[in-house]
Amino acid sequence: MSAWVLPDHIADVLPSEARHIEELRRGLLDTARCYGYELVMPPLMEHLESLLTGTGEALDLQTFKLVDQLSGRSLGLRADTTPQVARIDAHLLNRKGVTRLCYCGPVLHTRPDRPHATREPLQFGAEIYGHSGLEADLEALQLARECLRVAGVRDTTIDLADMRIVRKLLAGVALSPQRLSRIHAALAAKDAGELAALTHCFAADSRAALLALLQLYGDEAVLAEAEKALQRIDGISPVLANLRWLASRLEGAQVTFDLADLRGYAYYSGARFAIYARGASDALVRGGRYDEVGAVFGRNRPAVGLSLDIKQVVGVVPPQTLKAAIRAPWGEAADVNAAIAELRAAGETVVCVLPGHESEVDEFHCDRELAQVSGRWVVQAV
């Protein structure tokens, strides 16, 4: 095998794309800061039990594992940053009241989570801890929309669901993990035949409600249909009211609902959202409420958050036009170096042309040059 061949779904990022990624990273972190989020930088590697505690089987399967040569303990390379941020909130900061944290860094996956995806996403995320009200859910949605706007993503659709609906329908039913997994799969695939077979011994109301879920997707009219179809199930009306409240406050947004969507079922504890955009094969942003995420670290605080893969977003939006640069001659003279330093301090990109490479070009388009005119160094058009 050639030494330059990389593993499957791992790739080098070349200059043009790297510039786009870095510009977007800066823009997203600046946006989060404008909303009051503080930046944290968890390590890429942690003890395995810290990374996986309370996160479910899916994250376990996505996590690369290795043995620490110093301690002999099992380590993991993070596949998701949220558990680490929950640990920071619960154990290191240990603040009272609301805490807003954001992060941006690479994660590693043992398998790509969608066709043609990288196994090394650059994950950006933001978390709100300490508020159980819908105001925090709404803020996470608003921040997610603003992040996509900053990235240049247009024509988005927000899909809302709530994990509590299915949990209430399955409450009191004794199910093996295998059967529960099959029920989840049938709901996700909207397979009425399989779901009917798996729930044949359920109480009539629960079975009818589960089968009705398969048709409960679409615009806001779905919520009214759900009120009728699920009226015999205790506690459903407040959940639907919460979804209606959130949707009504997303001004100018196209909002849909899929009440059988169970992605993140083992993770989310309430409302969850996904934002789709034209040209993207999967959701660009996912988020929701996961109130139990910090319990394993000693603080069971309300929590809402969102995350996205910057590399995925970059793939669906055109890069910003690169600001034209200034070409300058390489030299040791103090006057030319002073002129170059002054231009760079003013925010200009100045590319020094090395001797013998005057005809070479790179990513930077130079529409001006630094030239000596009448003993002075001046910038003039090329």
UniProtKB/Swiss-Prot annotation:
Q: Does the keyword Amino-acid biosynthesis apply?
A: yes
Which GO-annotated molecular functions does the record name?
histidine-tRNA ligase activity
Q: Tell me which positions the record assigns to the signal sequence.
A: none
Q: Which UniProt keywords apply?
A: Amino-acid biosynthesis, Cytoplasm, Histidine biosynthesis
Q: Which GO terms describe its cellular component?
A: cytoplasm
- TM spans (from-to): none
Q: Which GO terms describe its biological process?
A: histidyl-tRNA aminoacylation; L-histidine biosynthetic process
Tell me the pathway: Amino-acid biosynthesis; L-histidine biosynthesis; L-histidine from 5-phospho-alpha-D-ribose 1-diphosphate: step 1/9
Q: Where in the cell is it found?
A: Cytoplasm
InterPro entries xref list = aa-tRNA-synth_II/BPL/LPL, HisRS-like_core, HisRS/HisZ, HisZ
The highest taxon in the source lineage is Bacteria
Q: What does this protein do?
A: Required for the first step of histidine biosynthesis. May allow the feedback regulation of ATP phosphoribosyltransferase activity by histidine.
Instruction: Give the family per the record.
Output: Belongs to the class-II aminoacyl-tRNA synthetase family. HisZ subfamily.
Assembly, in brief, is: Heteromultimer composed of HisG and HisZ subunits.
Q: What else is known?
A: This function is generally fulfilled by the C-terminal part of HisG, which is missing in some bacteria such as this one.
This protein's name: ATP phosphoribosyltransferase regulatory subunit
Give the organism, scientific name. Answer: Verminephrobacter eiseniae (strain EF01-2)
